[in-house]
Amino acid sequence: MDPEGFTSGLFRWNPTRVMVQAPTPIPPPQQQSPATPQTAAFGMRLGGLEGLFGPYGVRFYTAAKIAELGFTASTLVGMKDEELEDMMNSLSHIFRWELLVGERYGIKAAVRAERRRLQEEEEEESSRRRHLLLSAAGDSGTHLALDALSQEDDWTGLSQEPVQHQDQTDAAGINGGGRGGYWEAGQTTIKKQQQRRRKKRLYVSETDDDGNEGEDDDGMDIVNGSGVGMERQREHPFIVTEPGEVARGKKNGLDYLFHLYEQCREFLLQVQTIAKDRGEKCPTKVTNQVFRYAKKSGANYINKPKMRHYVHCYALHCLDEEASNALRSAFKVRGENVGSWRQACYKPLVDIACRHGWDIDAVFNAHPRLSIWYVPTKLRQLCHLERNNAEAAAATLVGGISCRDRLRLDALGFN
């Protein structure tokens, strides 16, 4: 027997078997220790108050006593300031727990901060959704979903013509064999939208100030109701209509215009109710806060420039409805446009101010439907000018001339 054959048959050398190593076993994942019943009960017992009151110096035992009364963080956020004060008084009377002065202010400050945080989260979420919608519309390569953005803008000067020209250019590039046309078009559209939104935010931050509420906006081109800084469709223009007449075609009548002022009054009442519930400052006139609330409620057709533009026309409608109706009928018969009718509404108001000692502000404040509106600057200037003219004319005559006599002379044709 060959010893070499026996050895080679018994011990076979396999290099691959030596190189392969057994895989190391994977250690089982470490299981987290389950929360003890005491820990879970601790978090449920406080109801989120520890995170709400933590940075405001409220003691732990105070938060525990509030939680024992059945209050949670969500409950406190939805309460008014008067209700918070009642809760703290109940805490002192029931548990005989002495609240520190800083704790009382800290509880109110924590609730206000939580309200602001929730409101900011809602605004960020809505802006994020709006940005996603605009981005999706820009990537699709079509401007059909962006009718509001492609409409003509009074401030930026944009119109549909550049958009159509861009679409034609992109189509020509794609038909010419360039596959980057859609991508370039989408990037260009997104950049334009971002620039437009940035400019609108800057403009709104400059003009959206409640301190300048008394200023008139006569110099703005808002006959069609196009507000600056708002993404809305251009509305139908107004035409002169008689009382009870419905405008035909894509037009709006004057009855609809006066109805918008009644809606603004309702929105003001809603804003006042919300402000009282929150313990905030309650507006007494139609301010930017009311217009923002109207837009948030879906009434995009109500905007500050348009309502300030025709407020003196609405004032004439409230103070002397017969004169307003007669003026509307006369301009309707003559076929005058709404701009001429708007200018003609100043003179009757100046005459009304003359009968009340030229105090047009007192005339507005005395009327329940006009007291919520600011007096237009132009109307106040006309009253001041007419008053100076009347005083100068009275100084030249012996004994002077009264306002009633001046109106009688105007009626007879002696101007």
Curated annotation (Swiss-Prot):
Keyword Methyltransferase in annotation: no
GO cellular component: nucleus
InterPro entries: FLO/LFY_C, FLO_LFY, Floricaula/leafy_C_sf, LFY_SAM
Site residues, Interaction with DNA: K281, N288, R292, G339
Record field: compositional bias (Acidic residues): 206-220
Region (Disordered), start-end ranges: 159-221
GO terms, molecular function: DNA binding
Predominant cellular place of this UniProt entry's protein: nucleus
Location of the protein in the cell: Nucleus
GO biological process: regulation of DNA-templated transcription
Keywords: Activator, Developmental protein, DNA-binding, Nucleus, Transcription, Transcription regulation
DNA-binding annotation, residue ranges on this chain: 234-238, 303-310, 374-377
Tissue: Acts in the floral primordia.
Pfam family, one: C_LFY_FLO
Gene3D superfamilies noted in UniProt: Protein LEAFY
Segments of skewed composition (Basic residues): 193-202
Signal sequence coordinates: none
Biased composition (Gly residues): 174-183
PANTHER family in UniProt: PROTEIN LEAFY (PTHR36079:SF1)
Family stated for the protein in its record: Belongs to the FLO/LFY family.
Reported function: Controls floral meristem identity. Is required very early in flower development and may act here as a transcription factor.
Protein name: Putative transcription factor BOFH
Protein source organism: Brassica oleracea var. botrytis (Cauliflower)
